[in-house]
Amino acid sequence: VRCVEETGYTIDSSTNVTAEELAADTLLSKDLHIDPASGEYKVLIYHTHGSETFADSRPGVIEDTVIGLGDELTRILEEDYGIPVYHDRTVYDVVDGVEDRSLAYDYASDGIDAILQQYPSIEVVLDIHRDGVREDVRLVRDIDGVPTAQIMFLNGMSRTNENGEIDYLYN
């Protein structure tokens, strides 16, 4: 667990994880390469909160939302890496024209389950969001002279220290 924390992962103080649950030896022994040779979809990109926008987004322009970001990531993975991507552009957090995030994960789950049943070749599933941060926070750093946005991969444990396992979310 300490190695995970020392290499860029954060374990939130409201939860916990054991070495057995991480199963690092099992993970490190797996071949995680994606073989695009079959031409079948290997990556699924979707957006539980597809209406999320950025500070400079133009109102009503879907290309300026996280869905537009997903379009660009799809293009890069397909054109630069040859990895076939299924990009689900469904806006799961707008119901009858009104933004409603309360059931977005339920709606997305139904949609994603159907896609995964239709395309069992998919190996990687990415739900792309954007974080809301204070106006004075800048999540850009210089990498080799290129301004680069910080990204975060979130792998969640469905339990809290206070209440234990969360019954409706499976680890």
Across the structure, where does each feature detected by a protein language model lie?
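Short amphipathic alpha-helices and their capping/turn segments at secondary-structure boundaries
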Residues: A23-G39, A114-Q117
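Short, small-residue-biased leader/transition segments that mark boundaries at the very start
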Residues: R2-V4
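Active-site histidine-acidic residue metal-binding/catalytic motifs
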Residues: K30-S102
